[in-house]
């Protein structure tokens, strides 16, 4: 009798897990992901995430929703306007801190995966200007105090905020730059290269992949250099903004003569903390198991690994994501 009871219990447990797995595999999800403008990398990532979810759960789909970008996506996901959202690490850091442009901390977002962390801040300076003032890195810029015309991106853009924090790491403000006889120009990234080429600025800072066509284009018009951050400054900026310390490799551009230390923007896939643990688990699982669907959307995504997906530290991972990452040994 005892043996029969144990056998029956064993069969029940096995049957339970088989049934649970079958239910999970047969689950169909209809989700929305909010990204940025159509045609950009984030729309491609949205398509890759859709493909991964379809592969893991046939009959499912993820609809891509355009938006104003990561700052807007914080509000959309936190208010339940979409199940999934893509947000830059620096935007997410500002959100959880309640720093500009947010009026108060956003506390109900959770991470599913780090999607990339290789969009480095590249401080590009006209080489003729650099030679005139003996500038090779940001420390030189601060020491020499030249009348530099610095394009920092538009107001409200987080790249502009990172440029501000880079200067701040050396004890310098925008007002200090102006006191040197310089200017701070709020020029969009698509304008910066043209402005450098036609002599309207001496320097710009942008967070884009390396190499990037806008920087290559500018370097064909005027000779340029890239300014390096010190170890201490890069760590200060990383701690303040949520960006990651990063090295731009010498081979990224023909005119670079060494590796350049900086910080990099990244993008994270986030959800509302009200999402069920099982849904978050299933999404995380299928993204890792079908990672090639995301790697294949653009050549810049080929470096994506499961280890990287589990490596962000700006906000907490969703409990469902944690459960999966622990199961496969990606986090302890």
Predicted regions mapped to residue ranges:
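Pocket-lining segment of extracytoplasmic ligand-binding domains
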Residues: 89-91, 99-100, 107, 111-113, ...
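Short, polar/charged alpha-helical segment
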Residues: 42-59, 163-168
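Short beta-strand->loop
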Residues: 34-39, 125-127, 144-159, 186-187, ...
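Short, low-complexity disordered leader/linker segments with a strong preference
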Residues: 1-30
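An extracytoplasmic/periplasmic, membrane-proximal ligand-sensing/linker region
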Residues: 170, 198, 203, 208-220, ...
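Immediate post-signal peptide segment of exported/extracytoplasmic ligand-binding proteins
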Residues: 22-33, 105, 139-149, 319, ...
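A conserved helix-loop-strand patch within extracytoplasmic ligand-binding domains
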Residues: 108-156
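Extracytoplasmic "Venus flytrap"
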Residues: 29-49, 69, 155-159
